[in-house]
């Protein structure tokens, strides 16, 4: 088991006995984060970024780590989330393997990796850990919390559980809960990992582990992150070269789209812990904003009770994983609570991953919204 920690990561310790929503507690746990841009004297220009399932806290390049970040085109000087104006905090999710405590981390009580002894993880736990991190950094109120994909779920949980912590919200391809299609896909991803003999009931060590399962899981995921329209335009029925086909043997990859999936799945499997994948994926399926909390009314009621002044809600029309109807639900619920909400459906072939790869369409509305907030 391995953790994959970016070199510029900083850490905030969680309080001992950090209670997990579905039972259990963590001791000696920590949250990894990175910051970009300067905090002003009033400490009121902080923007929190909550990530999807796989990213680390390295959203953008920094002087002490010039490696391009996973959101390099969105975060930085003069970019839509302008670090000349904003102090951006990107938090690695609790349960991940990118610096925050998760199944691959060492349990201080045993000196061994947690593996499956790590408590059941919830999106609410991720939100609570992020809220603790913000307060530990001396920030009592965020100018904005930005959440994309799973991070959109985490942001909504944070706003519900810590209503005074953020003034505004940007939701990019988020959701108040997972729909059956998304649950089915992630269920198959987890099954692929658990069915791999190398998983060993979570007790694999460094080395191969359930690599074949991880490759299949990632390929399944990538099929849902983009759209059929993009696959058609990008690959068509183009075949790989004769020599490459011969190297693969009978029934091996023949089309460029297969080669693309394999390349990116191999790269992902090299740098993500399978147990972390299982925990985070399961947390997404279990999340429902309408569960728990007082007030009733399900998810719409929870959204209407959030205390944000403004919100920007964006989603791709081609997103099959977190479809546009879920973005409309978020916008309607926040608006019912009195927030000034901008809802922007985006025409893009990039599907769910559009917030990552189609900055031409997602960037300007984000920049415009933050200019109003400033």
Swiss-Prot record:
Enzyme class, UniProt record, top EC level: transferase
Keyword Transferase: yes
One annotated Gene Ontology cellular component of this protein: cytoplasm
Gene Ontology molecular function: homoserine O-acetyltransferase activity; O-succinyltransferase activity; serine O-acetyltransferase activity
Pathway, per record: Antibiotic biosynthesis
Gene3D superfamilies documented for this protein: 1.10.1740.110, alpha/beta hydrolase
EC number: 2.3.1.30, 2.3.1.31
Compartments reported by the entry: Cytoplasm
Catalytic activity: L-serine + acetyl-CoA = O-acetyl-L-serine + CoA; L-homoserine + acetyl-CoA = O-acetyl-L-homoserine + CoA
Every AB hydrolase-1 domain range: 46-357
Listed Pfam families: Abhydrolase_1
UniProt entry keywords in alphabetical sequence: Acyltransferase, Amino-acid biosynthesis, Cytoplasm, Transferase
Residues with site note (Important for substrate specificity): 52, 55
Signal peptide bounds: none
Domain of life: Bacteria
Disulfide cysteine pairs (residue numbers): none
UniProt function note: Involved in the biosynthesis of the antibiotic D-cycloserine (DCS), a cyclic structural analog of D-alanine, used as an antitubercular agent. Catalyzes the transfer of the acetyl group from acetyl-CoA to the hydroxyl group of L-serine to yield the activated serine, O-acetyl-L-serine. It prefers L-serine over L-homoserine.
Subunit record text: Homodimer.
UniProt record similarity statement: Belongs to the AB hydrolase superfamily. MetX family.
Name of the protein this chain belongs to: L-serine/homoserine O-acetyltransferase
Organism, scientific name: Streptomyces lavendulae
């Amino acid at each position: 088991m391995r953790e994959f920690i970016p070199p510029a990561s900083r850490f905030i310790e969680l309080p001992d006995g950090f209670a997990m929503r579905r039972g259990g507690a963590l001791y000696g746990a920590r949250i990894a984060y990175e910051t970009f841009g300067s905090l002003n004297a009033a400490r009121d220009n902080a923007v929190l970024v909550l990530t999807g399932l796989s990213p680390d806290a390295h959203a953008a390049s920094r002087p002490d780590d010039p490696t391009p970040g996973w959101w390099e085109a969105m975060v930085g000087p003069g970019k839509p989330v302008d670090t000349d104006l904003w102090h951006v905090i990107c938090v690695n999710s609790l349960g991940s393997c990118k610096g925050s405590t998760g199944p691959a981390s060492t349990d201080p009580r045993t000196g061994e990796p947690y593996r499956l002894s790590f408590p059941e993880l919830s999106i609410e736990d991720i939100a609570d850990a992020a809220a603790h991190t913000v307060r530990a950094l001396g920030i009592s109120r965020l100018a904005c919390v930005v959440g994309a994909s799973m991070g959109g779920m985490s942001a909504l949980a944070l706003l519900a559980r810590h209503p005074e912590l953020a003034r505004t919200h940007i939701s990019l391809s988020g959701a108040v809960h997972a729909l059956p299609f998304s649950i089915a896909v992630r269920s198959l991803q987890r099954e692929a990992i658990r069915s791999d003999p190398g998983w060993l009931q979570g007790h694999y060590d460094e080395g191969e582990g359930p690599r074949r399962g991880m490759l299949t899981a990632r390929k399944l995921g990538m099929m849902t992150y983009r759209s059929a329209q993009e696959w058609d335009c990008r690959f068509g029925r183009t075949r790989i070269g004769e020599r490459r086909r011969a190297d693969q043997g009978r029934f091996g990859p023949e089309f460029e789209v297969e080669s693309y999936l394999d390349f990116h799945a191999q790269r992902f499997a090299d740098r993500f812990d399978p147990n972390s994948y299982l925990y985070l994926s399961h947390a997404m399926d279990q999340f429902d904003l309408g569960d728990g909390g007082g007030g009733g009314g399900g998810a719409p009621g929870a959204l209407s009770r959030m205390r944000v002044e403004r919100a920007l809600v964006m989603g791709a029309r081609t997103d099959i994983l977190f479809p546009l109807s879920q973005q409309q639900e978020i916008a309607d619920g926040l608006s019912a609570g009195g927030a000034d909400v901008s809802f922007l459906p985006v025409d893009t072939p990039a599907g769910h991953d559009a917030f990552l790869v189609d900055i031409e369409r997602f960037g300007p509305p984000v920049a415009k919204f933050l200019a109003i907030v400033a």
